[in-house]
Amino acid sequence: AGDRGYIGHQAARMMKRALVIEQRAQKAVEEKKKLLKNLEKAEELKLFPLKHHRETVIRAENLELFYGEKKVTGPLNFEVKNGEQVILRGKNGCGKSSMLKRILGEAISYRGKLEVASGLEISYVSQDAEQLCGMIDEFAIKEGVDPTLLKALLRKLDFSRVQFEKPIESYSGGQKKKVLLAKSLCEQAHLYIWDEPLNFIDLFSRIQIEELIQTYRPTMLLVEHDRFFGEKIGARYVEIQCTQD
């Protein structure tokens, strides 16, 4: 009798476990269906990149970056041409974000040669979105973009209208990143510099961003660790080596 009770208990546990697994599988199927439905319904994101008159818009020759007296990036040679998507790749602390900021004109010490094409219009997405605050219309006006267009793009990135009534500081990390991405998509630029654009971004929005880049082929310089994303957009990689004097 004791054995039968034990076997019955084990059978009940196995049935319960099987039910949980089945429920999880069903949930995954429903989520996939919802994602596909969203993709079918969603309007495509649009971008209107500019083409610079120079074929090469960025060129670095034997470029080294410094934090104070410490060299953090070894001699680096690369260029970005019109219509190219280039990803800087390297370990944390190797100066990838600093390289982007140096190209943007920030006062970061360097040695070597860095050429930025004259008259180059750049649209920048920062790695850090935590500092964002205020209402979305105020943010748009401050950044010099059309509030209506910004909100239309955010709606395509799965924002509800109710979200626009809340201050940006109350948004999740992913929502804040979407605000920066949508702001960049509002801007006509020769070069789009995006620092870790996929941070906190959901799969649905990620697919839209990949398709956008595949369709419009904007000139881009990115920092992004996700290899699959790089492959999807056909990016060329530039390796940054960490060095210290």
What is each stretch, according to the model?
Residues 52-245:
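ABC ATP-binding cassette signature C-motif
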Residues 1-70, 81:
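Coupling and communication elements adjacent to P-loop NTPase active sites across diverse families
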